[in-house]
Design a protein with these regions (language model features):
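OB-fold and OB-like single-stranded nucleic-acid-recognition modules
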Residues: 3-10, 17-214
C-alpha cells in the first residue's frame, strides 16, 4: 500500500502542475456547433458610446471610444504578434482575415497573404479570377484589442486557416505612452487601402471553431 504521505506529495505535485498550465489556457464560455459562415461581409452598425473604455498601462493610459458595433466571420490567413511598442500594450496581435470567395479553398492557390510591421500584404497570380478590388474589399488586417484576459489567451491559440468569428466594436484610441501623446484610429470601410485602412477591434467575444470565449 502506498504511503499516505508519499501519495499526498505526488497528488500535490500533479495539482500544482495542473494549476500552472491551466493559467495559460483560455476558459470556454460556451459551444456553438453551427457552421461559421465566411461567405458574408462583416456586419457593421453605427454606435455612439457614452462611456469610453479606459486602460491604464505602465507609464501611460489609453481612452478607447467605440464608434461601431462589429461582427466579422472569416478565415484567418495570417497572424502576427507584437510586444515591443506602445501599440502592443493594448493590441498584442493582428489577424489577417478573409471572407467571401477568398475563404473558399478553390481560390487559395491564387492569392497569398503575409504581415509585417502592423501591415498586411497580398500577392496574386496573373491567372487569378479575383481582381485586386475584390481582394481588398474581402480581406482586412485587424488590430485586436482583447476585452478580457481570457479572450487574449484564446486569440493566442488561433492558427492560420482556422475559421473565426469576432464580435465587439470598431474603436478609436487616444492617450499617452511614456509621456508622449498617441492616437490610433480605426477604418470604417473595407474598401480603403494604405495607412489607416486597418480595423482596430475591441473584441468582446471570439469563436474559434465550435469554442466560444468571453
Amino acid at each position: 500500500m502506498m504511503n499516505r504521505k508519499l501519495f499526498s506529495g505526488i497528488f500535490g505535485v500533479i495539482l500544482l502542475f495542473s494549476l500552472f498550465f491551466s493559467c495559460d489556457r483560455p476558459q470556454k464560455s460556451g459551444m456553438d456547433f453551427d457552421n461559421i459562415d465566411t461567405s458574408e461581409d462583416p456586419i457593421q452598425t453605427s454606435y455612439k458610446s457614452e462611456e469610453p473604455i479606459v486602460k491604464e498601462i505602465k507609464n501611460g493610459h489609453f481612452t478607447i471610444t467605440p464608434v461601431a458595433e462589429y461582427k466579422l466571420s472569416g478565415l484567418v490567413v495570417s497572424k502576427e504578434t507584437y510586444s515591443d511598442d506602445w501599440n502592443a500594450k493594448v493590441s498584442p496581435i493582428d489577424l489577417a482575415i478573409v471572407w467571401g470567395k477568398l475563404a473558399d479553398p478553390e481560390y487559395e492557390k491564387y492569392v497569398s497573404f503575409s504581415q509585417r510591421g502592423r501591415w498586411y500584404f497580398y500577392e496574386y497570380k496573373p491567372e487569378s479570377p479575383l481582381d485586386p478590388n475584390y481582394i481588398i474589399s474581402h480581406s482586412s488586417n485587424n488590430h485586436i484589442i482583447p476585452a478580457t484576459e481570457n479572450i487574449g489567451l484564446a486569440l493566442k491559440t488561433i492558427e492560420k486557416k482556422e475559421k473565426v468569428m469576432l464580435e465587439g466594436f470598431l474603436v478609436n484610441l487616444k492617450g499617452s505612452s511614456g509621456g508622449q501623446p498617441v492616437t490610433w484610429m480605426t477604418s470604417l470601410t473595407r474598401k480603403d487601402t494604405g495607412n489607416g485602412s486597418c480595423e482596430l477591434i475591441y473584441v468582446t467575444k471570439v469563436r474559434i471553431d465550435t469554442n466560444v470565449y468571453e
